[in-house]
Amino acid sequence: MARFFRRRKFCRFTAEGVKEIDYKDVEVLKGYITETGKIVPSRITGTKARYQRQLATAIKRARYLALLPYTDRHDD
């Protein structure tokens, strides 16, 4: 069996000391969305539960205000 080196997951928001995630910070939010527009789960990103809830709310607000797309593409 081959062993793989797995990078340790850590919460970026805890490390940076973020109090609240801002829905207007689109560049940060884009890092937590897949190509299809889905929110990436915390088990993959390593985000703590508190920040994952804030992240989901911020992404939904940004989508509602058209700062982020709901989906990446609409195939015709």
From Swiss-Prot:
GO annotation, biological process: translation
Phylogenetic lineage: Bacteria, Pseudomonadati, Pseudomonadota, Gammaproteobacteria, Oceanospirillales
Gene from which the chain derives: rpsR
NCBIfam families recorded: S18 (TIGR00165)
Chain coiled-coil ranges: none
UniProt keywords, alphabetically: Ribonucleoprotein, Ribosomal protein, RNA-binding, rRNA-binding
GO cellular component entries: cytosolic small ribosomal subunit
Taxonomic source organism: Hahella chejuensis (strain KCTC 2396)
GO molecular function, one term: small ribosomal subunit rRNA binding
Protein name: Small ribosomal subunit protein bS18
Similarity comment: family membership: Belongs to the bacterial ribosomal protein bS18 family.
Subunit text: Part of the 30S ribosomal subunit. Forms a tight heterodimer with protein bS6.
Chain's role: Binds as a heterodimer with protein bS6 to the central domain of the 16S rRNA, where it helps stabilize the platform of the 30S subunit.
Domain of life: Bacteria
